[in-house]
Regions:
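Alpha-helical repeat scaffolds
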Residues: 10-19, 46-56, 82-92, 115-129, ...
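Cys/His-clustered metal-coordination modules, chiefly Zn-binding fingers
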Residues: 161-239
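Structural register within alpha-helical repeat arrays
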Residues: 1, 30, 37, 71, ...
Length: 239
């Protein structure tokens, strides 16, 4: 009831007396409650309060990826891009499935710090650890700017053989369109429209507990109400 009403303080008080909340360990769930409170504090620009609440979340669940994600957002707001980058890397270390959620922010931090070469190294390593297409596309975007669209397209083509992906194919077509003419350009445009239509109506996330599908990341599944069970969908039509 307290969860439904978003009365997180009362929810913490009750959960702290329990071993489990539903099927999930109470300490794990309480960390999420503290993250909710920290998000609320951040929205009110109460960064000191948010930091205190995040510390509590970490005490209950030391490997909480969400806690690091919120900390990264606070650090970016304050212009501390090194701290933000460290926190974002910890998000992916604690839950590699959240890598797609932090790549854009990581890149932005590296740009601010002037360390884009380090980001390229990070992406090469991430590609070996993460089965999805997101780090491949992030690296291809950088290659396109540095070495040109042909180099980026060649890189994506090589990776598509290892991890078939409609998103990857769509980006490959984008890069190829700029270098094509006549009938080849027309055919690529048709293929691009088809891939866009395939992606437009596809969910991006799925709950690992109940199977709920969605296009946005929810920290609590709207279906089964479990915490941190919604992850990116993998495979040809996913990440």
């Amino acid at each position: 009831i307290y969860q439904q009403e978003k009365d997180w303080e009362s929810a913490i008080e009750i959960a702290d007396q329990m071993g489990f909340v539903g099927e999930q360990p109470a300490r794990y769930v309480i960390a999420q409650f503290y993250c909710e409170l920290a998000e609320n504090a951040r929205a009110r620009d109460k960064t000191d309060e948010a930091a205190r609440l995040l510390k509590k979340a970490g005490e209950y669940f030391p490997h909480c990826a969400r806690e690091r994600h919120i900390a990264a957002n606070i650090a970016r707001q304050q212009g501390d891009y090194r701290a933000a980058l460290d926190a974002l890397e910890q998000v992916a270390e604690r839950d590699i499935e959240l890598l797609p959620e932090v790549l854009d922010d990581m890149h932005a931090c590296h740009v601010e710090l002037g360390t884009e070469a380090a980001f390229i190294e990070y992406l090469h390593d991430a590609i070996t650890r993460y089965a999805g297409i997101s780090p491949v596309l992030a690296l291809a975007d950088i290659l396109s700017g540095v070495e040109g669209s042909e180099s980026a397209a060649r890189f994506i083509a090589g990776e598509l053989g290892k991890r078939p992906s409609v998103r990857g194919l769509s980006r490959f077509i984008d890069l190829s369109l700029s270098r094509s003419e006549g009938e080849a350009h027309d055919n690529l445009t048709i293929l691009k429209n088809m891939t866009d239509q395939l992606l437009a109506n596809k969910p991006v996330y799925q709950c690992r507990n109940c199977g709920f599908y969605g296009k946005a990341l929810h920290w609590q599944c709207p279906g089964c109400k479990h915490w941190n069970t919604i992850k990116p969908i993998h495979g040809v039509e996913g990440d």
